[in-house]
Amino acid sequence: MDRNIRDRLESAISKLLLYHPLYGEVFLFLNKIESKTIPTMAVGVIRQVDLALYYNEEFIKNLSGDELRAVLKHEALHILLHHLVRVRHAGYNPRGFNIAADMAINCHILELPKGAVYPKTFDLPEGQSADWYYKSLKDEAEKQKKDLEQMLADKGVDTVDDHGLWGEFDEEIISEKIKNIAESAIKAQEKKGWGDTPGGLVEQIIAANKPVVNWKKEVKWFINKVVELGRRNTRMRPNRRYIFQSPG
């Protein structure tokens, strides 16, 4: 491990914590793992239950300070917007969703390195969610009578980071960890004020982290309570003082 590269990474995270805690806070909860198997940088899962930031030293070495912080913001937003879980939960085509997720993020970040994909690449408006961009890509592929993979290959687009580590993991545990990280990051930014964070992005982050009621679980709990109450009542012997007697 190159100590200078690790120091650059930690310094960039420290600056984000100071000036943009929404992003910097995320990395306090992630393992930092140097890897030569990925060409750039990526958030992913380790041991199926822990989140990690993977980075290639050569990639970081070739970035300016502004570019490094921009890529870190990019990775933090994948966490804050639950993209790791969303692609599996919705059953999306992984490559198609990777491009859609990057379009949703990149239009809010300045100083990204060359090669980043933006909505304008597909003549789409900025400020939409990853799900919206994914549907738009699917619609365009159908219009061209191609499958999504073929259309993206013909366009020659790619992601600025590596999404290959969004593989197998315990979805319930990872979802809970992401929710806790996002809650901490949002609170940290609220203390400082949202500042120059784009309003549309703030709305997406808040919406992605609203508590969701598990109605299936709630209904099951309610039914169990009703059944339990019914059993309890049938076991109770009637009090003779309150037995209704019909006249006559």
Which role does the model predict for each range below?
Residues 1-72, 76-115:
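Basic/hydrophobic alpha-helical interface regions
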Residues 107-248:
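Negatively charged
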